[in-house]
């Protein structure tokens, strides 16, 4: 957790340099515990994503972990603000995480957001239509609220946290 301009926030992230930033059972438990604390204190959750997705070595434990994250997100929906920033890969089951948040930001050049890789779609190739890039996700899918460089995204998130109420019972914002 931390503070942005006096506002308590809870932040989680994936480090792509460690196991590709993949999510397994223990990483998911940290995220779900963070959601529990955020709900208890009525503070926003910010996710910073650069991940290969599911940790395949953990098989069904990792799949269950994704389900636990989704459940916490749905319980938090409408109660606390949820913000996601995608700075690298956000694929497979992890692609649902930004879809379940209130605000989604994407880095404009290297971020990719997809359930299935664009080449997995019949008749599509990345050279024809990259359905995973920020422009497509913003303009066509309507999932992304802001595209920019990492520093711009972090600045926009700080501004957003200062404008939003901390939770559904906050009358001070």
Language-model features: locations:
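Active-site loops and adjacent core secondary-structure elements that bind or stabilize anionic groups
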Residues: 173
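Long, structured ligand/cofactor-binding scaffold of large enzymes
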Residues: 1-77, 82-83
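Conserved catalytic cores of soluble enzyme domains
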Residues: 49-169
